């Protein structure tokens, strides 16, 4: 996947980071904000390995539908590129130019690290659930429900996490 995203370092060192939320009982929840929804993340979900992930279909749709929001939030500074991502993926295109050579190295890294976590969860039998700020519960997005500070959407969020939980045989 690293090479498919344009990775060019002969001996890359990866650091996908920690999980967003580790719950009692071993459930891990990743809450993905707007910077996770773009063509690079969609590319990582195209393989056969991802077909049974409960978030693949909605995430691929959101990558297409919300890439413009990703661009708005992530076309500048370290959200577009940084020295460590350039070591992995090479020089970036001009900020905002995803069709240019290099694209957005930081976006590629984020997509790769999400993919690595997904693959690891599949391989290791980890109970991972991914939800998106763009997911809809009741009449609003998860982001709006979380920002409200109200507890009125707690059960809807719990239900979404349960629906997106990776189940292993």
Model-inferred region functions:
Residues 1-169:
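Nucleic-acid endo/exonuclease domains
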């Amino acid at each position: 996947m690293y090479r498919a995203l344009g990775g060019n370092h002969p001996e890359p060192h990866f650091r996908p980071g920690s999980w967003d939320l580790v719950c009692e009982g071993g459930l891990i929840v990743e809450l993905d904000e707007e910077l996770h929804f773009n063509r690079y993340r969609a590319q990582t979900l195209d393989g056969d390995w991802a077909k049974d992930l409960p978030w693949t279909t909605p995430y691929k749709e959101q990558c297409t539908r919300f890439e413009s929001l990703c661009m708005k939030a992530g076309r500048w500074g370290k959200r577009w590129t940084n020295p460590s991502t350039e070591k992995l993926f090479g020089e970036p295109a001009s900020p905002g130019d995803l069709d240019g050579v290099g694209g957005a190295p930081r976006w590629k890294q984020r997509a790769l690290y999400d993919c690595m976590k997904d693959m690891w969860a599949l391989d290791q039998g980890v109970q991972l659930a991914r939800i998106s700020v763009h997911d809809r519960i009741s009449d609003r997005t998860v982001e709006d429900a979380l920002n409200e500070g109200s507890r009125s959407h707690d059960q809807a969020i719990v239900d979404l996490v349960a629906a997106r939980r990776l189940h292993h045989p």
